[in-house]
Amino acid sequence: MALTIVLILFSVLALIIGLLLSRTSPSGGLSSLNGQDLEIFKKTKDRGWIKGLQVFMFLLTIVMILIIIFYRVS
């Protein structure tokens, strides 16, 4: 039950960050999740909070995937 709540909170947080980044630049937000190149680690004009939020959203997504994999294995 606690794991479900954690995953829901992480998903909502990632969605909010993605929506905040959607309008900031063509390389950010949810547009990078639809099969195009993920431009987090490429040189772009994004600096400061935008780049930090992009990296945080990417890491949050990886953490959620790992939690689901470990939960299914055990």
Curated annotation (Swiss-Prot):
The chain crosses the membrane at residues 1-21, 50-70. InterPro entries: SecG. One of its GO terms (cellular component) is plasma membrane. One of its GO terms (biological process) is protein secretion. It is found in: Cell membrane. It is a multi-pass membrane protein. GO terms for molecular function: protein-transporting ATPase activity. Keywords: Cell membrane, Membrane, Protein transport, Translocation, Transmembrane, Transmembrane helix, Transport. It comes from the Bacteria. Involved in protein export. Participates in an early event of protein translocation. Belongs to the SecG family. This is Probable protein-export membrane protein SecG. The lineage of its organism: Bacteria, Bacillati, Mycoplasmatota, Mycoplasmoidales, Mycoplasmoidaceae.
